[in-house]
C-alpha cells in the first residue's frame, strides 16, 4: 500500500476482515480491532508522499455491520476529542440491501447507528456510503459473466472495481471541463477524433505506461496484474454548474437536467466508440474478451478540487457551487477564487469591483444584491 502511494496512487483499504476489538486470537490474546489499523494508515498518509508531489491519501472501508464501526466513526469525529482520532484518511462504509431495508423497516439499533453515520458525515464529510449490492447489480457485463464481485471502493468512492488476494484494482482518471463544453462539443482534431475519444485514447495509453513502469517494481505485482486484465479507465467531468450558469439555467431546472443528460451521453457514446476501436487495434484484455471493448470501465465522476482551479472550471465535478467568492487554502498557498460567470456579468452591468467585498462578507452569496434579478 505504501509503495502504491509513493508511486502516485490514491489507495482504498478494506478492513472488513479484521477481527473486532476484544475478539480472541487463536495464538492467544485479544484483537485490538479496527481503529489501531486505521491509525497506522492515517500515519502512513502523513509520512509517505504521493508521487513525490503531495501527501499520501488513503480511504478505509468497513461494512456498516462490523462491530467496530461506531468506534471508527467516533475516531473520525474531531468534535469528541478522541485521542485516537485520525484526520488525514477518509472513511467509507459498505451497506447491503438487507441492512438498509431492515433499518428503514424500523430496526431501532440500525436507525441509531445510521443517525450517528449521518452526524459524522455532517461534521467531517465522511464516511462515504457505498451501497454494495446496488454496485454489483450495475457491474459491467464482462464482470458479471466472470463472477467478479465488488467488495469495496477506491480513495474517493468514484470507482467500484474488483479486488482479491492476487489483484489490487487500478484505474486512471481524468475529467473534461464542461465549463468549456460549447467550445469542444463539435471539435475534431487532425485525427478526426472528438475530445472524449481522444481522452479515452490518452487514458488507455496511461494504463500502458503504468504497466510498463510498474512491472519493474516488485511490490506492484497485484496492481499490474489487475491493470493488464482490466485496463479500467475513469473519464469524468467538472464545471457542470458553471456550464449551467453560462446557459442561464438554474441548477435544479428541467433545462439543466436535459443538458446534463446530453453532455454525459455524448461523452459516454464517444468513449465507447474509442474503446471499441482500441480493442480492434490492440486487442481485448483478459477480462474484456468477447465484449468488444479495450477497457472494463470507462467513466467515473471524481472530485476535482485542484483540477477545477487549474482549468478554470471553478465548480468541482458535478457539484453545485457553494460560494461565488471565497479564499482557498491549498498546498501552494492561499488564493482568492471568484465565479468567472458572475464576474463577467458584473462587467456587463457596469457593477464595480467593490461589490466583491460584500459578497465575501455574505460568505459567497449574492442574495443581498439588488443589482441582480432572477433573470
List each model region and its residues.
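Long, C-terminal-biased catalytic regions of enzyme "large/alpha" subunits
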Residues: 1-375
Amino acid at each position: 500500500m505504501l509503495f502504491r502511494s509513493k508511486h502516485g496512487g490514491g489507495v482504498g483499504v478494506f478492513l472488513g476482515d479484521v477481527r473486532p476489538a476484544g475478539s480472541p486470537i487463536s495464538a492467544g490474546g485479544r484483537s485490538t480491532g479496527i481503529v489501531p489499523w486505521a491509525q497506522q494508515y492515517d500515519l502512513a498518509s502523513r509520512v509517505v508522499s504521493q508521487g513525490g508531489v503531495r501527501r499520501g491519501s488513503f480511504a478505509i472501508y468497513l461494512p456498516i455491520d462490523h462491530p467496530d464501526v461506531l468506534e471508527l466513526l467516533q475516531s473520525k469525529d474531531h468534535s469528541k476529542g478522541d485521542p485516537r482520532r485520525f484526520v488525514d484518511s477518509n472513511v467509507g462504509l459498505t451497506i447491503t440491501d438487507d441492512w438498509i431495508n431492515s433499518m428503514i423497516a424500523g430496526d431501532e439499533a440500525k436507525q441509531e447507528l445510521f443517525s450517528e453515520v449521518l452526524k459524522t458525515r455532517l461534521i467531517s464529510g465522511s464516511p462515504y456510503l457505498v451501497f454494495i449490492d446496488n454496485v454489483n447489480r450495475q457491474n459491467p457485463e464482462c464482470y458479471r459473466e466472470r463472477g467478479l464481485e465488488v467488495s469495496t471502493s477506491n480513495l474517493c468512492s468514484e470507482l467500484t472495481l474488483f479486488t482479491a488476494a492476487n489483484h489490487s484494482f487500478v484505474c486512471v482518471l481524468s475529467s473534461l471541463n464542461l465549463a468549456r463544453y460549447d467550445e469542444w462539443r463539435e471539435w475534431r482534431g487532425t485525427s478526426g477524433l472528438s475530445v472524449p475519444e481522444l481522452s479515452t485514447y490518452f487514458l488507455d495509453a496511461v494504463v500502458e505506461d503504468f504497466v510498463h513502469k510498474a512491472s519493474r517494481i516488485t511490490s506492484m505485482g497485484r496492481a499490474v496484474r489487475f491493470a493488464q486484465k482490466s485496463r479500467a479507465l475513469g473519464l469524468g467531468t467538472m464545471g457542470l454548474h458553471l456550464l449551467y450558469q453560462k446557459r442561464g439555467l438554474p441548477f435544479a431546472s428541467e433545462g439543466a437536467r436535459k443538458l446534463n443528460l446530453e453532455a454525459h451521453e455524448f461523452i459516454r457514446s464517444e468513449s465507447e466508440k474509442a474503446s471499441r476501436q482500441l480493442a480492434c487495434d490492440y486487442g481485448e484484455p483478459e477480462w474484456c474478451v468477447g465484449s468488444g471493448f479495450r477497457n472494463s470501465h470507462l467513466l467515473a465522476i471524481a472530485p476535482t478540487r485542484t483540477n477545477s482551479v487549474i482549468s478554470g472550471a471553478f465548480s468541482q465535478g458535478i457539484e453545485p457551487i457553494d460560494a461565488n467568492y471565497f479564499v482557498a487554502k491549498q498546498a501552494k498557498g492561499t488564493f482568492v477564487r471568484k465565479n468567472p460567470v458572475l464576474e463577467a456579468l458584473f462587467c456587463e452591468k457596469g457593477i464595480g469591483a467593490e461589490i466583491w467585498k460584500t459578497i465575501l462578507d455574505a460568505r459567497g452569496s449574492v442574495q443581498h444584491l439588488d443589482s441582480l434579478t432572477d433573470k
